[in-house]
Curated annotation (Swiss-Prot):
<comment type="function">
    <text>Part of the ABC transporter complex ModABC involved in molybdenum import. Responsible for energy coupling to the transport system.</text>
</comment>
<dbReference type="GO" id="GO:0016887">
    <property type="term" value="F:ATP hydrolysis activity"/>
</dbReference>
<comment type="subunit">
    <text>The complex is composed of two ATP-binding proteins (ModC), two transmembrane proteins (ModB) and a solute-binding protein (ModA).</text>
</comment>
<keyword id="KW-1003">Cell membrane</keyword>
<keyword id="KW-0547">Nucleotide-binding</keyword>
<dbReference type="GO" id="GO:0015412">
    <property type="term" value="F:ABC-type molybdate transporter activity"/>
</dbReference>
<dbReference type="Pfam" id="PF00005">
    <property type="entry name" value="ABC_tran"/>
</dbReference>
<keyword id="KW-0997">Cell inner membrane</keyword>
<keyword id="KW-0472">Membrane</keyword>
<dbReference type="InterPro" id="IPR003593">
    <property type="entry name" value="AAA+_ATPase"/>
</dbReference>
<dbReference type="InterPro" id="IPR008995">
    <property type="entry name" value="Mo/tungstate-bd_C_term_dom"/>
</dbReference>
<dbReference type="InterPro" id="IPR004606">
    <property type="entry name" value="Mop_domain"/>
</dbReference>
<dbReference type="InterPro" id="IPR017871">
    <property type="entry name" value="ABC_transporter-like_CS"/>
</dbReference>
<feature type="domain" description="ABC transporter">
    <location>
        <begin position="1"/>
        <end position="231"/>
    </location>
</feature>
<dbReference type="InterPro" id="IPR005116">
    <property type="entry name" value="Transp-assoc_OB_typ1"/>
</dbReference>
<comment type="similarity">
    <text>Belongs to the ABC transporter superfamily. Molybdate importer (TC 3.A.1.8) family.</text>
</comment>
<protein>
    <recommendedName>
        <fullName>Molybdenum import ATP-binding protein ModC</fullName>
        <ecNumber>7.3.2.5</ecNumber>
    </recommendedName>
</protein>
């Protein structure tokens, strides 16, 4: 499948939405930003609910909109599924009726695949009034998938659900993109949802793209600083489970070539891919490698950037290079920064307790 190509502009009151993006053809791309940043407006332009002032929209090798060529495909020809914040089910139809609404080419095998993935089979004869919020959203997702879209748009689909219902729906969302091999644009203001679900991240601010790319890259960028206080700053890694230490309940993961980390035991097979979060506050710095220490992870690194927090906080953020294109953030006090005379380019050792990275910080991605 081809990339999703978005080059468009739209005046939104006092805000000018101006986007130039190439998004992956498979996986979940989160659209993140403050209220009013243009997140929902962007996906409404893609869907055809609203029209760009100027620009291009290309999906799966097709042109959906082109102001220069005079192309504007109607909504029903765009092959896009849309899941709203509220499920928008028809109350007088059963779940089966809602799922089949608008389906013009019945495919029993595909219907069975969708209902099985979303665990909808026991609900097919029920009506929306008899469903929980999480069940309604699963039906809405199923209805969108049954249109066999080239792209799935999701506008804060979990925002109206309480935490137990969010936990109910989240595993289904994790499986969607890979199972159906399609791109999903997922609007959210929840950092927890993004951490768990997103492969790719776009940060919008007042209609402009501040940062876009793989989530591990964008998560550590300056674009995310307004949402991450120094106490919450962290690094995301795509890692591979290397081995388990059954005696001590630890798992070793591979972050990069010759970069390994011991963490609390991960319930995953050796060779599994995981996404792992390491909090900057859990990383300490030493100038010399300790010879006797309880800390299980002592990694050679090089300081590549230093950021000072506002003076009242007396903290310093250090960007450490562990290997080419493999970086780790650490937060130290101004006192430690001064006493160790830390400078960009200096070789150091990053220390991370094995118990500081727990099961909640590791997400299985395959």
């Amino acid at each position: 499948m081809s990339e999703v190509i978005l080059q468009l502009q739209k005046r939104l009151g006092e805000t000018q939405l101006d986007v130039d993006l190439r998004l992956p053809a498979v996986g979940i791309c989160a659209i993140f930003g403050r209220s009013g940043a243009g997140k929902t407006s962007l996906i409404n332009l893609i869907s055809g609910l609203t029209t760009p002032d100027v620009g291009e929209i290309h999906l799966a090798g097709r042109t959906l909109f082109s102001s220069s060529q005079g192309i504007q495909l109607p909504i029903e020809q765009r092959k896009i599924g849309y899941v709203f914040q509220d499920a928008r089910l028809f109350p007088h139809y059963t779940v089966r009726g809602n799922l089949n609404y608008g389906v013009t080419d019945a495919d029993p095998e595909y219907f069975a695949s969708v209902t099985r993935l979303l665990a909808l089979e026991p609900l097919l004869v029920r009506y929306p009034r008899d469903l929980s919020g999480g069940e309604k959203q699963r039906v809405a997702i199923g209805r969108a998938l049954l249109s066999k879209p080239d792209l799935l748009l999701m506008d804060e689909p979990l925002a109206s659900l309480d935490m137990p219902r969010k936990k109910e729906v989240m595993p289904f969302l994790e499986n969607l993109a890979q199972h159906f091999r399609l791109p999903i644009l997922y609007v959210s203001h929840s950092m927890q949802e993004i951490l768990r679900l997103a492969d790719h991240l776009v940060v919008l601010e007042q209609g402009k793209v501040l940062s876009a790319g793989p989530i591990e890259q964008v998560w550590s960028s300056k674009a995310m600083r307004p949402w991450q206080s120094f106490s919450e700053q962290s690094t995301l890694f795509s890692a591979t489970v290397a081995k388990h230490h059954q005696t001590y309940g630890l798992t070793q993961v591979r972050l990069a070539e010759d970069v390994w980390l011991w963490v609390q035991q991960v319930e995953a097979d050796v060779g599994s891919s995981v996404r792992m979060q390491v909090r900057a506050n859990d990383v300490s710095i030493a100038l010399d490698k300790p010879t006797a220490s309880s800390i299980r992870n002592i990694l050679p690194a090089r300081i590549v950037a230093i950021e000072h927090q506002q003076p009242s906080k007396k903290s310093v953020s250090l960007k450490l290079e562990l290997a080419p294109h493999c970086y780790l953030w650490a937060v130290v006090t101004e006192w430690a920064h001064a006493e160790l005379a830390l400078e960009v380019g200096m070789p150091v050792f990053a220390q991370i307790k094995g118990v500081s990275v727990a099961q909640r910080d590791v997400i299985l991605t395959n």
